[in-house]
Amino acid sequence: MYFFLVQCLYGDYMNLIYEDKKIKIVDCNTFFSRLKGFMFKKDIQHALLFNKCNSIHTFFMKSNIDVIMCDRDNNILYYYNNLSKNKIIFPKKNVDKTIELPVNFFNIKINTKVRID
């Protein structure tokens, strides 16, 4: 039921895979889903994908998040661990997509790849 509601609010969900772990990821492909993101959410159980996004903010967030910024080929260019609320990540060069996810779900290393299925 939870993922049905997530799909209704945000859009389609897939799997984000890194090394041998995976988590559900929702493609935020509507204006509302991109605007809301994880704002006002306490319990984060999935990841969010923002295509064509090279900057984010954490205003109005209730919990910390991890942020992965990738190029078009899903190479990890930037990784922000345990990003707290009321922060801004200014635009980064060569970033094509941004992924927000629960804190410490993956042990991310720069210059590796994520897979989205």
Predicted regions and their residues:
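Compact, glycine-rich, soluble single-domain proteins
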Residues: L5, L9-D117
